[in-house]
Design a protein with these regions (language model features):
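N-terminally biased helix-coil "hinge/interface" segments that flank
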Residues: 1-456
Length: 456
């Protein structure tokens, strides 16, 4: 009898890590859900894989491994990236300060401030050399300036270097030579060339993507290297290991380690759900051709996507964590409505849900891990929507009394409500949170519905 072969998909969220194992020959699925380990998500993944092994799965039979993660997203949101230096054409160091005209949020905000530069002026170096709009060399690269810059940035403690020259997307020769020189002087540096990260017209969007790539590349490389070591040690030795990209495609782990396309993983987790949802209606008699709205709710947020003609809608421009990111991605709208979303009373005395989340650590009050802020999950227990004795398939017991006490103390009593009214109010508030972006969601859904009807 031939040994079984499997395909494993792993999605690491802010609260839980989900693993789905497909028996290729039998077509059966096995599922594991474990708590995410925020300090090192690889630990949660290996716990889930260990659970499969305990159920009799031969881990050496896993022939394909696909991974959706928020590791780079969280690093950007929390500003936990690497120390970055920037090399740019002589006379253009102010580009990172001026940026573009795009604003996130309220365009009428008189006090709007652009996010601080990833590579400050003290770590920015101007390099002689120019390439024109057609790709012709107007001025040769000043290689001595590159050597001086690399040595100075190394001495300053820089870990990652971004290189962004004018019209490099037409002729990458100067950037490529710069990268080679940096490797001679500073072999341990992570190097991001704009011609590799985002080879397209528009100076600031290309620079922004390159800087973000340089900022996050060491974070992702360290994580993937550690995960690969743990996978090999566990017996998962397949080399078919892939990381989900923002556009719903995949990149090999090797590409994630080299760091040329790190920035394409910023929406890795949500993209996987939207891409998978596009396949679900294809066998229902033609629904795949109609407009579909998908909702992917986890412990921290809810991601909304639109599917038309059997494929998710895509965009090539966007803003992530207040920073411009013009890379191909699925068109996703995120709202702060998840099981771990914290419930609180604002200064006006109104009930609010999120955007803060209790995450996996400490988690909701009912987890009993030191969390003292009531969450949607705690309200669900009070409403009777969750069985505290059978959470995560019965592997985790929830403290219903602690959930009630937290809601009573922090929500019901201050708002002069009964406990039941407070819990029900939280459920209603989640609906309101889901309407925070009604214009975008409604308009796009209406367009899909109109298109679908016209195509019948």
């Amino acid at each position: 009898m031939a040994a079984k072969t499997y395909r494993l998909g792993v999605d690491v969220g802010g609260t839980h890590t989900d693993l789905v194992l497909l028996d290729v020959a039998g077509g059966t699925l096995a599922v594991e859900k474990v708590a995410t380990t925020p300090k090192n998500p690889a630990l949660g993944i290996m716990r889930g894989i260990g659970n499969f092994a305990a159920r009799g799965v031969d881990l050496s039979g896993i022939e394909f491994f696909s991974h959706g993660t928020t590791i780079t997203t969280n690093a950007l949101l929390e500003m936990r990236g690497a120390k970055v230096g920037l090399l740019i054409n002589r006379g253009f160091r102010a580009i990172q300060e001026t940026q573009g005209q795009a604003r996130d949020g309220n365009v009428f905000d008189y006090f709007f401030q652009k996010p601080p530069p990833i590579a400050p002026q003290s770590l920015t170096r101007e390099i002689g050399g120019r390439i024109d709009y057609a790709g012709a060399v107007l001025e040769p690269l000043d290689e001595d300036a590159v050597r001086r810059a690399a040595a100075e940035l190394k001495a300053a403690g820089v870990v990652s270097i971004a290189v962004c020259y004018l019209f490099a997307f037409m002729n990458p020769a100067h950037e490529e030579r710069t990268g080679a020189i940096i490797r001679e002087i500073f072999p341990d540096a992570h190097i991001s060339l704009s011609s590799e990260v985002l080879s397209r017209v528009r100076e600031w969007p290309r620079m922004s993507a390159t800087l973000l790539n340089a900022y996050l590349a060491p974070v992702l490389a360290t994580y993937i290297t550690d995960l690969e070591t743990r996978l090999n040690a566990s017996g998962v030795t397949t080399q078919q290991r892939f990381l989900m990209q923002s556009n719903g495609g995949v990149m090999p782990f090797a590409a994630a380690v080299t760091g040329h396309k790190t920035v394409h993983s910023l929406l890795s987790g949500p993209a996987a759900g939207a891409r998978a949802s596009a396949y679900l209606p294809r066998d229902d008699g033609g629904a795949g051709g109609r407009g579909i709205v998908t909702l992917d709710m986890g412990g921290t947020s809810c991601d909304i996507a639109f599917i038309e003609g059997g494929a998710p809608l895509e965009v090539t421009e966007g803003i992530v964590a207040r920073r411009q990111l013009d890379v191909p991605a699925l068109d996703l709208t995120t709202i702060s409505a998840g099981g771990g979303s914290i419930v609180w009373i604002d200064r006006a005395g109104f009930l609010s849900v999120g955007p803060q989340s209790a995450g996996a650590d400490p988690g909701p009050v009912c987890y009993g891990r030191g969390g003292d802020n009531p969450t949607v999950t705690d309200a669900d227990i009070v409403c009777g929507l969750l069985n505290p004795d059978y959470f995560l398939g019965g592997t985790q017991k929830l403290d219903a009394a602690a959930a009630r006490a937290a809601l009573e103390t922090k929500i019901a009593t201050p708002m002069k409500m009964t406990l039941a009214e407070a819990a029900a109010g939280i459920r209603l508030r989640i609906k309101a949170v889901g309407e925070q972006k009604p214009t975008t969601i409604t308009n796009e859904a209406d367009n899909l519905w109109t298109t679908s009807k016209a195509g019948k």
